[in-house]
Amino acid sequence: MDKRISIAIDGPAAAGKSTVAKVVAKKLSYVYIDTGAMYRTITYAALEQKVDIENEEQLMEVVKNVKIEFQQGENTQLVFLNGQDVSEVIRTPEVTNRVSIVAKHRLVREEMVRRQQELAEKGGVVMDGRDIGTHVLPDAEVKIFMLASVEERAERRHLENMNKGFDSNLEQLKEEIAQRDKLDSEREVSPLKKADDALELDTTSLSIEEVVQKIMGIVLGVFAK
């Protein structure tokens, strides 16, 4: 498997993208790039600095002074903000419920996309997000669009929150996920949408292993060409 391709995995909030992308990257010995974590890190930094996240100019001041780095931990990927490990704090509900607001700003997205493309320029990457196949890596050899029902995604996020010790309300999560879908799909810059050449994968009734197997089958098909 010497071929170093780019794999783009898109889909709505809590569709299981990052969980699956990490496993696929590990199987291929590829670099996993969690673009959602990049936007979460900006959101966290802005909240810490008490910046108005609706104000693009103020947000860009935050972005300019933020260095985001990824490091492979033992069983997970660690995210660093200016040298500080923020892997856990960027997953709190406070950040989760505001990240779509930060991500809707055109200048913020342009800068993040530039950084993401830089990370991916040599290939051998698995990148997940909302606009990877359509905007960040439009020439990716493999493009997957993962879907799951709002109910299923809320259940997954609820379990995730409980496991991390966060307060969690299932009905509230359903509302929040539906709201994030709306924000992500309706924003003017790089909205959430399936690339024309992406393969759609409904994961509602599939396990992580089954989704990974399906994606690996697609990747091996590309290698065989």
Curated annotation (Swiss-Prot):
Similarity-based family: Belongs to the cytidylate kinase family. Type 1 subfamily.
Species per Swiss-Prot/TrEMBL record: Bacillus anthracis
Catalysis: reaction(s): CMP + ATP = CDP + ADP; dCMP + ATP = dCDP + ADP
Keyword field contains Transmembrane: no
A Pfam entry, by short name: Cytidylate_kin
GO cellular component terms, A-Z: cytosol
Cellular localization per UniProt: Cytoplasm
Positions bound to ATP: 11-19
Gene3D superfamilies named in the record: P-loop containing nucleotide triphosphate hydrolases (3.40.50.300)
InterPro entries: Cytidylate_kin, Cytidylate_kinase_dom, P-loop_NTPase
EC number(s) given by UniProt: 2.7.4.25
Protein name as catalogued: Cytidylate kinase
A GO BP annotation: nucleobase-containing small molecule interconversion
Keywords, sorted A to Z: ATP-binding, Cytoplasm, Kinase, Nucleotide-binding, Transferase
Signal peptide: none
